[in-house]
UniProtKB/Swiss-Prot annotation:
Keywords: Ribonucleoprotein, Ribosomal protein, RNA-binding, rRNA-binding. One of its GO terms (molecular function) is structural constituent of ribosome. This is Small ribosomal subunit protein uS11. Pfam families: Ribosomal_S11 (PF00411). One of its GO terms (cellular component) is ribonucleoprotein complex. SUPFAM superfamilies: Translational machinery components. It comes from the Bacteria. NCBIfam families: PRK05309.1, uS11_bact. Part of the 30S ribosomal subunit. Interacts with proteins S7 and S18. Binds to IF-3. Located on the platform of the 30S subunit, it bridges several disparate RNA helices of the 16S rRNA. Forms part of the Shine-Dalgarno cleft in the 70S ribosome. The keyword Transmembrane does not apply.
Length: 128
């Protein structure tokens, strides 16, 4: 008879404050919740919530992703957060509003979108 392999139970940390990173591109929105040291507590994305194709880039999809990530983090005791927003996508504001509606105390909002000092050549203009 095979021996039973002992698995470690997931340790529930009690984290009071953390950092929420919202990466909003034109195609998707990714929300990552970390502790102050940068260790990931939970994450979610519009694509991971079941939105496919162009529906991933909607503000509603960003709101759902944000609610999902925050719900997982609040189960571990998260209460106050700092928010870092990156990217030009349509889900920026709605993801942020979903955080505040979930009951988290937002202490700081910072835009960390990388802006080139004339770096790489951008993609060609779309002709629709």
């Amino acid at each position: 008879m095979a021996k039973r392999v002992q698995t470690k139970k997931k340790v529930r940390k009690n984290i009071a404050s953390g950092v929420v990173h919202i990466q909003s591109t034109f195609n998707n929105t990714i929300v990552t919740v970390t502790d102050v040291a940068g260790n990931v507590i939970s994450w979610s994305s519009a694509g991971g919530r079941g939105f496919k194709g162009s529906r991933k880039s909607t503000p509603f999809a960003a709101q759902m992703a944000s609610e999902d990530a925050v719900k997982k983090a609040m189960a571990q005791g998260l209460q106050t957060v700092e928010v870092y927003v990156k990217g030009p996508g349509p889900g920026r504001e709605s993801a942020l509003r979903a955080l505040q509606a979930a009951g988290l105390t937002v202490t700081m909002i910072r835009d960390v979108t990388p802006i080139p000092h004339n770096g790489c050549r951008p993609p060609k203009r779309r002709r629709v």
